[in-house]
Amino acid sequence: MANLPKSSVNYPGTLTPLEPNRPSPQPDRTPVPHSPPVVASPIPPRFPQPSFRPDQMSSPSMKSPSLLSPANGIRTGSPIPRLSTPPGPPVFNTPVKPAAVPFRTSPATPQPMAYSSANSSLPVSTPSFYSNGSSVGSQRDLPDVVRMEEPIAADSPYVLFSANKVLKQKKLANVASLGFGAIVSAGREISPGPQIIQRDPHRCLNCGAYSNPYSSILIGSGQWQCVICENMNGSKGEYVASSKNELQNFPELSLPLVDYVQTGNKRPGFVPASDSRTSAPVVLVIDECLDEPHLQHLQSSLHAFVDSLPQTTRLGIILYGRTVSIYDFSEDSVASADVISGAKSPSAESMKALIYGTGVYLSPMHASLKVAHEIFSSLRPYTLNVPEASRDRCLGTAVEAALAIIQGPSAEMSRGVVRRAGGNSRIIVCAGGPITYGPGSVPHSMSHPNYPYMEKTAIKWMENLGREAHRHNTVVDILCAGTCPLRVPILQPLAKASGGVLVLHDDFGEAFGVDLQRAATRAAGSHGLLEVRCSDDILITQVIGPGEEAHSETHETFKSDAALSIQMLSVEETQSFSLSMENKRDIKSDHVFFQFAFHYSDVYQADVSRVITFKLPTVDSISAYLQSVEDEASAVLISKRTLLLAKNQKDAVDMRATVDERIKDIALKFGSQVPKSKLYSFPKELSSLPELLFHLRRGPLLGNIIGHEDERSVLRNLFLNASFDLSLRMVAPRCLMHQEGGTFEELPAYDLSMQSDKAVILDHGTDVFIWLGAELSADEVKSAAVLAACRTLAEELTEFRFPAPRILAFKEGSSQARYFVCRLIPAHKDPPYEQEARFPQIRTLTTEQRMKLKSSFIEFDEASFCEWMRSLKVVPPEPR
């Protein structure tokens, strides 16, 4: 998203397992003396209210808390850089929501925090105590104030900061080339644990922030001080205690992450809460204009799909071509359907007659499995002699019909009202070509004289349909396959506005079938709202993710609430929001605070408020700040800001140049000049960052690997909404080499891994490649065993990833091997000492093996990583 004017905010547009065993540093301990008492008074709002636009979102000065995640090495401190432009509201954009990998698949287990007195301004309205802890008047033995003394770094898969410390100096913190921000995900479903609280939270009456482990507590009166606005608040006596140990019994005062859960079946029209996850309906909307080869694959995928559904899942089946066929499950062992015209939107009267008739259009799987198989077996290939792209497809009318049968008889009662149904309903479209008939359609030929206007009209209509689906708590996923051009710009708004995803597949085979199953069963909350609050020194300048501006009437507001509020289109751990932040001024305090609050209804119909609070230390030292930078999180944030501007191939070429300039600027601002040279050394603390960005500029997101603009558009939208783990893999592939004994060694993604006696797995997010060397392939028995081991690992690595990646296996020298080779850094051109420094495994090769490896490469003009860095007049950093 591009930055909007100050008060505008836009969202583009969503966490996989963290890397295990990565330590999380703790912030510096800096005990602060108590500050003198201050009379509490209302604090006026300090941040402008964010405003949103369709493709971008800027927001007020908000801060985002960050919990640590071991796998991704999240840290507790984080610098706050600012863009070079004047502060403005965050920019929000909403590209397609990919079901990427969540931040971490391991559940977060926040650790309890210790308490102690610290600096705070407290009101003199509590005569029994002074803010410095000394007793007065009655001379009670109780300490006056209890406050967090040393925050313990808690592991969290939900928030990742680009650094775990914040620079105090505004000028340095806001260097745009590096930047500061956070990647935030709603995370996994709630699980039993001490973090669950089944009562109303204590919130600041002034700004709306929640009580947390960093709040100062007057244990004599139970008052607590907000860390965001410093307002004093009552606790209705709940926080009155004789010692700080008693306060540790409150999860919100001892854990940085808590889930406030309110249960109860408040939603009409669904079964009890215990069964609600599987009761939300799934409606398949299937293209009937397929040729026989595609149809056979689709039928196999559909049969497997219904067999995988839970018995209580309610299923609907709709076919579309020139007409819309809505299948009736009331006829046992027979495929029976009611047919409506696809030329225009179905009228309310016709749908009412259908729904109130004798037909059953949504039926639980335990009662309709046999009928579903009969319906799929009855499908026939397209018989007319019409090119694929010119066949009439009324997808828009079919989705409208699907929405109508999901709403059912209660639709007219809910007119103008947002009904809260139990769990997200899903419409899954199986498409093999463009929408060319009925509402939202475009002409068969792009040379039609009125095509640009008709395309614009169709895009707007599809976006409105997506918004209507979201209003009725229904997600529309569009799974496309085949070789026919799909006119992605028209289909994309429907998926995006409803909170769904659009995915392209080569065919309707295995990968399509896996995605079909994962689309229907992935956990997703509804009615999501994200609130971000932070210290007054921090400004959120841009938001990228699957959401849009939340209007004030849709959520609770407070007197001086400066929170950035985002309406989430879907609540899934496979998606995330990327927040860019700046310093509003030089920071005087030793810490800054961030608080994220996710409000949503989960799949079990419980209302959940997930609150995450974090305290990051501030530093003057540039070196200390750079050491706290998380290269991977920083690279993902930079990549998302870059991809937001790369809307087409021409933009992508321009963005490669901006990556080059970014590297040069970081070296200039934070590096050092080489003596007696015009070269600059890249900061050694950021040793991994330039290589990650090199992968970005030459990979499928910005490079020339993907040829068709539809594929590029889908990949871009998927990336902008993806969770941290999937985003990282889409930027920089992970390379694993099979070793003797069945183990795998992780190596840099360099072409030096292409050793003829080895097998290599390359995980690039949406694609996983298995490369078998020629020497290994010659031994059929051994290569079969190695291939099986590689496939098993590839499936394990991507087990919960959505969309499911393609897994392709090929031999060295085959035509498909080019997909693998083009994603590896061409390090074979570097001198031996650089190869050994950056790819240590090569030291294990004999001289003969190294010569053989070198001779296997075909020379071409593309620069290696080291050559690229030197072309920018920058000395590459030594690898860690």
UniProtKB/Swiss-Prot annotation:
Biased composition regions of type Polar residues, renumbered to the chain: 1-13
Tissue specificity: Mostly expressed in seedlings, roots, cotyledons, leaves, trichomes, leaf primordia and flowers, and, to a lower extent, in mature siliques.
A single GO BP: pollen exine formation
Chain positions recorded as Zn(2+) binding sites: C204, C207, C226, C229
Region (Zinc finger-like): 204-229
UniProt GO cellular component terms: COPII vesicle coat; cytoplasm; endoplasmic reticulum exit site; endoplasmic reticulum membrane
Places the protein is found: Cytoplasmic vesicle, COPII-coated vesicle membrane; Endoplasmic reticulum membrane; Membrane
Entry's transmembrane regions: none
Biased composition (Low complexity): 57-70
Region: Disordered, residue numbers: 1-95
Superkingdom in the source lineage: Eukaryota
Pro residues composition bias: residue spans: 20-36
Molecular functions per Gene Ontology: zinc ion binding
Topology within the bilayer: Peripheral membrane protein
UniProt keyword annotation of Lipoprotein present: no
Phenotype when the gene is knocked out: Despite normal fertility, impaired pollen coat exine pattern formation with reduced sporopollenin levels, associated with altered pollen germination. Plants lacking both SEC23A and SEC23D are semi-sterile and exhibit developmental defects in pollen (especially at the late uninucleate stage) and tapetal cells, including defective exine and intine, as well as signs of cell degeneration and structural abnormalities in organelles of the male gametophytes.
InterPro entries attached to this UniProt entry: ADF-H/Gelsolin-like_dom_sf, Gelsolin-like_dom, Gelsolin-like_dom_sf, Sec23, Sec23/24_helical_dom, Sec23/24_helical_dom_sf, Sec23/24_trunk_dom, Sec23_24_beta_S
Annotated keywords: Cytoplasmic vesicle, Endoplasmic reticulum, ER-Golgi transport, Membrane, Metal-binding, Protein transport, Transport, Zinc
Subcellular location, principal: membrane
Subunit structure and binding partners: Component of the coat protein complex II (COPII), composed of at least five proteins: the Sec23/24 complex, the Sec13/31 complex and Sar1.
Family: Belongs to the SEC23/SEC24 family. SEC24 subfamily.
Function recorded in the entry: Component of the coat protein complex II (COPII) which promotes the formation of transport vesicles from the endoplasmic reticulum (ER). The coat has two main functions, the physical deformation of the endoplasmic reticulum membrane into vesicles and the selection of cargo molecules. May contribute to COPII-coated vesicles formation and ER-Golgi vesicle transport. Together with SEC23D, essential for pollen wall development and exine patterning, probably by regulating endoplasmic reticulum (ER) export of lipids and proteins (e.g. sporopollenin) necessary for pollen wall formation.
PANTHER family, per database record: PROTEIN TRANSPORT PROTEIN SEC23, PROTEIN TRANSPORT PROTEIN SEC23 A
The protein's name in its UniProt record: Protein transport protein SEC23 A
Organism listed in the record: Arabidopsis thaliana (Mouse-ear cress)
